[in-house]
Amino acid sequence: MFRIYGIGSVDSYSKMTLEIKKGQNINLMEFLRELVELQYKRNNIDFRRGMFRVTGDRVDVFPAQLEDIAWRISFFGDEVEDIKEFDPLTGEFIQSFEEVKIFANSHYITPKPRLENAIKEIKKDLKIRLEEFDKEKKLLEFQRLKERTNFDLEMIQATGTCSGIENYSRYLSGRQPGEPPPTLYEFIPENSLLIIDESHVSVPQINGMYKGDRSRKKTLSDYGFRLPSALDNRPLTFEEWNMMRPPTIFLSATPGLSLIHI
């Protein structure tokens, strides 16, 4: 399986982590605040990945990078007293740790300086687009885009995210218009091997994914549902994918000429 749809920047994601050590001095409320900044949500009832729950001086965290393991971090005053790994389904303790690293719950999480710059760029492009709609007498599109984008900006400023945050990924990753989006390829080692099964079916779909996505996003942009920059939240083109992919094995019982000549 290959991933050609854009995700957040590997540089931003790798920087947004929280390291907790046994014996570390940290206030409980400060720790919870940092979890929220990493897009974790508090839920004492439905405990799933990307969630945390609090009971007295004890915090259970279900790390985004793990599938079936959670961590229990116990505090004594302003000090981390204990860190234990447990099964969130049964509550059974597995082992203790001296330190753990908690990764962000979203690939679109962005350091504050870059986030502030992204907000400025979004406002700048919004102003340009609204002027275009005003000049073309498209009042409905004008109002729709203004309300939607300003609401998103308020949410981003308050919480660091919003519904559909991926549509602003170009600003968050600091890319120029038309640049390829960050993808899973940026997260894998350089010595990786890509294996594509049924490649005579899979590979031709790559261009189709890009064209279909662009057509849909252009409609959203034309009618004021999104800024034109949403078109840069896209899958890779075939040319970009072909240049970016690691060494690849194409598995096919009926390869066509186009596949043979890749």
Residue ranges of each PLM-predicted region?
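ASCE RecA-like P-loop NTPase motor cores
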Residues: 1-260
